[in-house]
């Protein structure tokens, strides 16, 4: 298993096995200082993961996407696991799969460092860092 890419972006589309991304980012700047009573809310984003599998990876697997804070605690209810099966035809040496998840109304109870943890079969294989910060005067993103 080779993770070619794991990214947080504004939008993602898969058509004819081609992965298209729009607006990859790693920082969210909020206009109000978030708190547990008034969390910062990001209206919509997407996670895109592209993975190449070889013959040793054949069989059933499960992908999990978890959003965690700097202390390692989840910030949202767990997304349902994505079960999938890897099968390679005899004439292929590898197969590539695209996985996407759309996240709406993502809430951040405080400014700070977060990450999107990508797990296959319960093992963390990639981590996408995400910084949530309060805007300074004149700053937007």
Give the residues covered by each predicted segment.
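Contiguous segments within soluble domain cores/interaction surfaces
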Residues: 2-109, 115-120, 124-141
């Amino acid at each position: 298993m080779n993770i070619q890419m794991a990214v947080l972006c504004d939008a993602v589309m898969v058509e004819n096995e081609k992965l298209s991304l729009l607006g990859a980012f790693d920082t969210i700047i909020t206009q109000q200082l978030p708190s547990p009573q008034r969390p910062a809310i990001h209206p919509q984003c997407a996670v895109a993961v592209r993975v190449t599998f070889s013959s040793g990876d054949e069989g059933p697997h499960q992908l999990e996407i978890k959003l965690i804070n700097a202390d390692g605690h989840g910030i949202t209810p767990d997304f349902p696991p994505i079960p999938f099966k890897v099968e390679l035809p005899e004439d292929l040496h590898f197969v590539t799969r695209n996985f996407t998840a759309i996240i709406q109304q993502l809430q951040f109870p405080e400014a700070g460092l977060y990450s999107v943890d990508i797990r296959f079969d319960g093992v963390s294989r990639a981590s996408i860092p995400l910084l949530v910060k309060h805007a300074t005067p004149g700053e937007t993103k």
